[in-house]
């Protein structure tokens, strides 16, 4: 099977490439250092599996890239490779197209099993994460979440400028410099955005921005 590895650390890309290329049924055809490059490599090489890190540079995080790649290249199975053992990240990446989720500190044998599992079209979740979490994901995915009122419409012009920048991973200082406002102003707008939209976390904000098509290439 053909594999692409997306991680912003060169040593990680090299290390995992060595492990995978040693297998008779695996070949790392390309690597990427951020989400944009990952999208380009998948488009070019059409891999069977993409190993995607979540915490990549601001602008195109693994959360954002996962959704876009899953939509554009459904034949490529995405396996999230990360240090985050937070159930909220697992929930959002699975709902946005990933087929599996494994921690970077997992044994090599577990990584290989995860890759072969998603390659077959099955879902793989790291053994450290509970079964109840997967059940919660399935339950929430089947719920009708339609609302009659869209809170997006009550965001101010400045909040609409800041929302996609937050979702792309830019910090308060970086956003302030881009928009020529103070850090305190950005922090205030950020609080207002989360409150108005009823969001409680960064993954929720990223998912919301994706649904509203605010993070297009």
Swiss-Prot record:
Residues 148-213 form the HTH luxR-type domain. The modification 4-aspartylphosphate is found at residue 53. It comes from the Bacteria. Residues 172-191 bind DNA. Its main location: cytoplasm. InterPro entries: CheY-like_superfamily, Sig_transdc_resp-reg_C-effctor, Sig_transdc_resp-reg_receiver, Tscrpt_reg_LuxR_C, WalR-like. GO terms for molecular function: DNA binding. Member of the two-component regulatory system NreB/NreC involved in the control of dissimilatory nitrate/nitrite reduction in response to oxygen. Phosphorylated NreC binds to a GC-rich palindromic sequence at the promoters of the nitrate (narGHJI) and nitrite (nir) reductase operons, as well as the putative nitrate transporter gene narT, and activates their expression. This is Oxygen regulatory protein NreC. It comes from Staphylococcus aureus (strain NCTC 8325 / PS 47). The gene is nreC.
């Amino acid at each position: 099977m053909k594999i692409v590895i997306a991680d912003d650390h060169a040593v990680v890309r090299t290390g995992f490439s060595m492990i995978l290329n040693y297998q008779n049924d695996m070949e790392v055809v390309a690597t990427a250092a951020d989400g944009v490059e990952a999208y380009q490599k998948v488009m070019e090489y059409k891999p069977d599996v993409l190993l995607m890190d979540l915490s990549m540079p601001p602008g195109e995080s693994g959360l954002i890239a996962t959704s876009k790649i899953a939509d554009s290249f459904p034949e490529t199975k995405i396996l999230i490779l990360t240090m985050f053992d937070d159930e909220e990240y697992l929930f959002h990446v699975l709902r946005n197209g990933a087929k599996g989720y494994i921690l970077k500190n997992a044994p090599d044998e577990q990584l290989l099993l995860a890759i072969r599992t998603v390659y077959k079209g099955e879902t793989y979740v790291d053994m450290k994460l509970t079964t109840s979490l997967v059940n919660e994901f399935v339950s929430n995915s089947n719920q009708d979440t339609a609302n009659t009122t869209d809170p997006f419409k009550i965001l101010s012009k400045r909040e609409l400028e800041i929302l996609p920048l937050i979702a792309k991973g830019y910090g308060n200082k970086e956003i302030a410099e881009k928009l020529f406002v103070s850090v305190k102003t950005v922090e205030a707008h950020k609080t207002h955005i989360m409150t108005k939209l009823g969001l409680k976390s960064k993954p929720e904000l990223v998912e919301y921005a994706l649904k509203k098509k605010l993070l297009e290439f």
